[in-house]
Amino acid sequence: EIGRLLAHLPVLAAPTRDTLTIEHEGVTHTYHGLGDSQAARIWEIQALTGRRASEICMLDRHPLTRIDFGGGPASGPADPDAFVARLRYQQTKVDGVDPTILVTQAVVTIIEEQQAWFTEHRPDAADGPYLFVQPRGNARGLNPRTYRSYAD
């Protein structure tokens, strides 16, 4: 259930030394953080866009194209649900379709957070092609994060 998943995303992202208390549907639980902010961002983008896990895991390092509203940033939509960019993803199931979707500022913000995380935590992989990288055995960031690496 998507509500439960979203309620527990902070546990996935929190450092392993942290303890979090999550209340969902009237039930309170305490968890230790799992320390995987990349996986949390993958899940969140997946929930907000409806794209497949593999499509999110294989996003290019710079997958966004901002929508030009013709009058500069101030003339863009103030509605948080308005589309502000196109997200280019890896289409692996269907041939002959445009592999882009319109996304809101919430998705743009998550992608910008991941780009900042990448710069801070994986500067050795700065030239790698993927936004989400395999966490182990991938010093140069040439391999995308696999579904298996965050599903377990």
Label each PLM-derived region with a short phrase.
Residues 1-152:
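Extended accessory and catalytic-adjacent subdomains in large enzymes
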